[in-house]
Structure formats: C-alpha cells, structure tokens
C-alpha cells in the first residue's frame, strides 16, 4: 500500500498555535504511511520564526511571497509556485493552515487537480480583524472555497459553530480537532525568575502571545495598570512581539519596573515556571495554545470568554473567564493573586484537564484518522484500514465532529 503524499501549506511559521500544530503533525505522523512536505513563507520583521526557535532541523520548502503581506502580484506568484509544486509532488492531500494559505493553497489544489483538500481553521477572521463589510467578503470567499474542500477542521466546537453560522461549509464537512501541546522540563520558580531578571518575591502575571490588534495589548496594559495598583508587589511580564510592540513599550515607561517586556523566547517553559497565572485579553481567538501550555505548567488562567477559550478554561474550575472588559479582567487577576488556595486549586485542575485532553499524540491520531478516512473514500486505501478507527472528538454529540467513514 503506497504512502499518502500530503502537502502541508501555512503562510508563515510565526510563533503561535498554527506553527506548533504544523510541526507536531510533520514530526508525528508515521513516515511509512505518510510522505509529507511543508511549504511556508517567511515571517515579518516583527515576528519570530517557530522553525528557528523550536524546530531548526525540520525540512521546509520556502515560498518567498507566501508570507503575511497581501498583494495581488505577490499572491499570484505564490499561487503559481504552489500549483507547480503540486504538479511535481502529486500529493493525494493538500492540507492548508491559516487564512491566506487556505485561499492560495486550495486555489492551487483546484488548478493542479489535487483530489484531497483539507483546511484547518485555527480561528477565524469573522470579527476582530476587519470592518464589517470586509468581514462579509471574507465569509463569502471562505464559503466559496468550502464548496471545493473535502474536510474543514476547526480547533474547537465554538469556532465551527461560528463558521457554520456565517454560511461557511456544511455540518458534515467539519471535524473538530483541538490543538495538542507538550512542554519541556520546567525549571524551578526561583531559577526561572533569576533567569528572567524578575523579583523573587511577589506574584508574577504572564502574557504569552502576539502583540497585534485582535489580541488587544491596549487592554493588557489597562489590566496591568489596575493589577499593579491593587497589588503593588505584582509584576506583569509580556512574552511576545508584534506590530503593536512599540505601543506596549511606550506604555511600559509609566509602569516600569512592574511591567517587563521579554520579546519572544525559545525557552517559554522559563516564563511559565516564573509565573503565578496567565492572562489573555483577546477580542477573538481559536483555541489558544498558550492557555493549554499554561495548564500543562499547572497555572490557572484569566481570559476573555471568546472563541473556543471556554473549551480549554473551565470557568471557576481551571481559571476565570470574563467579558472583554479590562476592569473585570483585572478584578479576576487580583482575586487569584490574593487567594493562594484558590489559585493553586485551579492550577492543579488545569494541569489534570490539559494533560488528559490536549496532548500531541491525540492531535496526531485525530489527523491520521481523518486522512485515513479520505484515503478510503477516494479508493487509495482499502476500507479494512479503518477498522478500529475512533472519532477525533469521542465525547462530542455533534455529527460534524466524527470522521466520515
């Protein structure tokens, strides 16, 4: 039985959930069953490349014009390169990740007549990114592309429901595959704080993620200001970068030394080890890997209740969720900083939940089953191959969450 050839396309490998998931699949799917190639562009000047930081040995095919920037001429060239590579590689399946790669990659797959097409929504662009008019155009484009896609994968059930509500795809096309993550060994708290130059005494609140508009770094600063005012010995650390990093740096002047900017770090485990809780302030999310990593590190989370965040963070059990309001978020943070017992209980529950549900092995198995279902459907593999296959989300009652047999 010949291995399935899978061409994986992602616009850029900037540090974040999509890059982590792509690397996990490239490394985790069995090589005797899947021949994979990863195609990606380059990160922007304000971004760190996940390949450089966490996966330097991974083979990557670079497509220069496939990055973040949108431009008709560059996108047309990237489309042509992808279609040419597909004709050479002759993949059974093209699997695209993120919006731009999903558009160009699926268009190229149609041109190159690739039979199997899969797209993963690691979130969506329906709100928080564009004007309402542009968001409607994005939804119309995604709806059209969905008609030419075999399987639509979402990282959470809420993301799926939002997309269906916008008229994108049909329920039977969808499969929910939550992210999978693993942390390396965590240093001790004192050693981690010493490495980061943080005070040994006092609580530490950490933000791990991009500094872009949808993540609302302005709200992050407002929360930090309120928390530091209420808990004067608290330190807020920001691990990340982005196009709004300069604005955050300017705001730091009024909060220094209680607000620390770390930039991107390859040793994110050090940040989690130094922290007492993790903060997320976004207007829109898929299923943030930083919250899964926080749970794996035994840390509670205070987050906005957006996207599929509530599928990671159980309000009152593994963290605290709040509306998109800086004052309410700050109150949740202060509550946890002042109640050591509650904070430790939530962190222990978060660790148990994330270790059970969000491991990389489960992610790989979910996607492997999805590919196997396509292989049988298209006649590439015999149907007996699926004997014993399980649903990607076994506890879900939604029919779209089961791999079509």
Language-model features: where?
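Conserved donor-binding/catalytic core segment of Leloir-type glycosyltransferases
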Residues: 7, 199-215, 221-225
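A short, active-site helix/loop in glycosyltransferases that binds the activated sugar's phosphate group
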Residues: 147-173, 181
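N-terminal strand-loop element at the rim of the active site
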Residues: 4, 8-16, 20-74
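Aromatic "clamp/platform" in nucleotide-sugar-dependent glycosyltransferases that forms part
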Residues: 264, 283
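Conserved acidic donor-binding segment of nucleotide-sugar-dependent glycosyltransferases
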Residues: 315-316, 320-327, 335-341
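A short helix/loop element that forms part of the nucleotide-sugar donor recognition site in Leloir-type
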Residues: 47-52, 186-199, 204, 351
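Short hydrophobic beta-strand element within catalytic cores of glycosyltransferases
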Residues: 300-303, 313
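A short, well-ordered alpha-helix in the C-terminal region of glycosyltransferases
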Residues: 335, 342-357, 363-369
């Amino acid at each position: 039985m010949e291995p399935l050839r899978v061409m994986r396309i992602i616009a850029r490998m900037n540090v974040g959930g999509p890059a982590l998931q792509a690397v996990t699949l490239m490394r985790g799917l069995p090589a005797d069953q899947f021949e994979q190639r990863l195609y990606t562009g380059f990160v922007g000047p304000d971004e760190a490349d996940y390949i450089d930081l966490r996966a330097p040995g991974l083979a990557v095919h670079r497509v220069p014009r496939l990055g973040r920037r949108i431009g008709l001429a560059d996108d047309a060239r990237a489309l042509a390169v992808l279609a040419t590579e597909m004709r050479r590689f002759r993949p059974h399946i093209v699997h695209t990740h993120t919006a731009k790669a999903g558009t160009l990659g699926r268009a190229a797959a149609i041109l190159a007549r690739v039979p199997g097409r899969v797209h993963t929504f690691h979130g969506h662009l329906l709100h928080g990114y564009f004007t309402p008019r542009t968001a409607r155009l994005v939804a119309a484009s995604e709806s059209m592309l969905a008609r030419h896609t075999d399987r639509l994968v979402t990282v959470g059930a809420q993301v799926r429901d939002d997309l269906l509500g916008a008229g994108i795809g049909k329920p039977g096309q969808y499969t929910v595959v939550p992210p999978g993550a693993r942390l390396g060994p965590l240093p001790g708290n004192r050693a981690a704080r010493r490495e980061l130059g943080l005070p040994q005494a006092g609580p530490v609140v950490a933000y791990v993620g991009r500094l872009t508009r949808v993540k609302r770094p302005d709200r992050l600063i407002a929360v930090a200001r309120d928390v530091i005012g209420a808990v004067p010995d608290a330190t807020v650390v920001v691990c990340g970068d982005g196009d709004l990093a300069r604005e955050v740096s300017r705001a730091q002047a009024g909060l220094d030394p209680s607000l620390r900017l770390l930039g991107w770090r390859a040793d994110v485990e050090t940040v989690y080890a130094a922290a007492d809780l993790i903060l997320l302030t976004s207007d829109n999310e898929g299923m943030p890997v930083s919250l899964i990593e926080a749970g794996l590190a035994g840390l509670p989370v205070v987050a906005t209740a957006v996207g599929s965040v509530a599928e990671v963070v159980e309000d009152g059990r593994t963290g605290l969720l709040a509306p998109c309001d800086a004052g309410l978020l700050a109150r949740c943070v202060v509550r946890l900083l002042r109640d050591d017992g509650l904070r430790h209980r939530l962190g222990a529950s978060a660790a148990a939940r994330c270790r059970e549900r969000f491991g990389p092995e489960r992610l790989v198995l979910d996607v492997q089953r999805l590919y196997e279902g396509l292989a049988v459907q298209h006649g590439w593999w015999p149907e007996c191959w699926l004997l014993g296959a399980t649903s990607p989300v076994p506890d879900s009652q939604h029919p779209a969450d089961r791999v079509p047999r």
